[in-house]
Amino acid sequence: MYMEISSASDDSIAYVETDPSGRYGRFREVLGKGAMKTVYKAFDQVLGMEVAWNQVKLNEVFRSPEPLQRLYSEVHLLKNLNHESIIRYCTSWIDVNRRTFNFITELFTSGTLREYRRKYQKVDIRAIKSWARQILNGLAYLHGHDPPVIHRDLKCDNIFVNGHLGQVKIGDLGLAAILRGSQNAHSVIGTPEFMAPELYEEDYNELVDIYSFGMCVLEMLTGEYPYSECTNPAQIYKKVTSGKLPDSFHLIQHTEAQRFVGKCLETVSRRLPAKELLADPFLAATDERDLAPLFRLPQQLAIQNLAANGTVVEHLPSTTDPTRTTDMSITGKMNSEDHTIFLQVQILDGDGHMRNIQFPFNILSDTPLEVALEMVKELEITDWDPLEIAAMIENEISLLVPNWRANDSSIRHESFGHEDDEDNGDTEGRTRLFSSASSSHDSPVAVRENNDDSSNDVIPDMDDGNRSSNRLLNSSTYHYSPAIDDDQNQQQRRRVRLQQKMRSLVDTRTQVLHRSLMELINKRRGRGFDPNTNELQPQPSSTDFIRRC
């Protein structure tokens, strides 16, 4: 039962119909139309968001059993799939009076990937990589499903885009097949231009989707439909079964991209599965921002806004990772006596178990990203990205210390006062104490002293033989974004670090002045003053805190 709050307005758009619960209202606007179904724009009154209303006329479906089977297959699959690269299903029902079958899915603002690519002729190779990686992640999920799922009709017409987010998702699963055990599929079905050679032999497995994926990437790169030089399906069949690639394949100017597409279009015995293709160098980012999923930005902002109010994050299906199994909130508290900041993390799992973790945060030496990486490793957090956690921490610190964001280079923190990485010898590692209410022991977490990160280099240099070997946070912790260690990139990173250090000099001096002022105030108030030495005791750092413990 939903309570409707309405307001009088002449500009409001009336619903053509609503679902049985009254939650979803359909408009007349048609988003797309196929041979079997029509997709309308609709509105979800509970979440306050636009959705896609898929409608099928049952009279048309019942003319033959095949369309009915396709419809059932699509809805049944969507109800059981849950992945960020697969179109999200909401609900379905049959309208007996109108003789229609209806189901609600998420809305895509920019249509299909084919329409989107034809609309925007100039697309950077980094965008192609991002789209390809999202699609391949979706295929890896489908093929790794239990039992495995084959799409069988993957093409740019069946991939949908949210252009303002850089997000693509796989849809139209009406032709998908579920492989039971180790059996292969045995029906010829799909779109000829995207069908693998073995499909015509009626004996194939999930690798046919990899072939179709390669054709999708080919279309993304060239903007041309595969085998557009052919005038009929018979010509396409002859080329495909003889192993001849489309003419557009030879138009690819990017060498690595052409090699990658060729890998996807190999014969089935040499074709790699989705999980292995994800590790291909073509999809690896040379810059950590190359493949940054732009659609995650609204998620981070939403998390920050909720965490700022100390609210446990609710994972709405429209904004969060559907594979996530825990809720997390981070709140900060400042000690008014010594101005030490303590952060409290609450983690709620799917079984209702709550973990409370408290630890100090030193605004002069700690960075949100370092702390987030520690948390991910030591608390064994697998369903949260370190950057998301870092954004929550940064938001809390900024609320407690408003000027901190300006005096700190945000998540990409640079410390001024040490040499470059190549000049650094052995450095002392700091440790932080995470205390969890759900465990009987405290876990010390080591952090590297060197905060020297650049925008292109988040992996610490582990070649230094003098580096301490007892640090728990080793290089494997940082491998959430690839980097290239050639001489040119190393020189560029050194230049970036030097520039950032120079820019942070003024901010660093501001921090020093602020600290000196606070020490003077505390001294006059009689806080932190040692009468034996007639000196002011410094503000305790994370290391001092641990030693006292």
Swiss-Prot record:
Residues 25-283 form the Protein kinase domain. It catalyses: L-seryl-[protein] + ATP = O-phospho-L-seryl-[protein] + ADP + H(+); L-threonyl-[protein] + ATP = O-phospho-L-threonyl-[protein] + ADP + H(+). Its EC number is 2.7.11.1. Pfam families: Pkinase. The active site is at 172 (proton acceptor). Keywords: ATP-binding, Kinase, Nucleotide-binding, Phosphoprotein, Serine/threonine-protein kinase, Transferase. Residues 452-463 have a biased composition (Acidic residues). GO terms for biological process: photoperiodism, flowering; protein phosphorylation. Disruption phenotype: Plants display early flowering and altered expression of genes involved in the photoperiod flowering pathway, such as ELF4, TOC1, CO and FT. The modification Phosphoserine is found at residue 504. Coiled coil: none annotated. GO terms for molecular function: ATP binding; protein histidine kinase binding; protein kinase activity; protein serine kinase activity; protein serine/threonine kinase activity. CDD domains: STKc_WNK. Residues 414-490, 525-549 are annotated as: Disordered. Belongs to the protein kinase superfamily. Ser/Thr protein kinase family. WNK subfamily. Regulates flowering time by modulating the photoperiod pathway. This is Probable serine/threonine-protein kinase WNK5. The gene is WNK5.
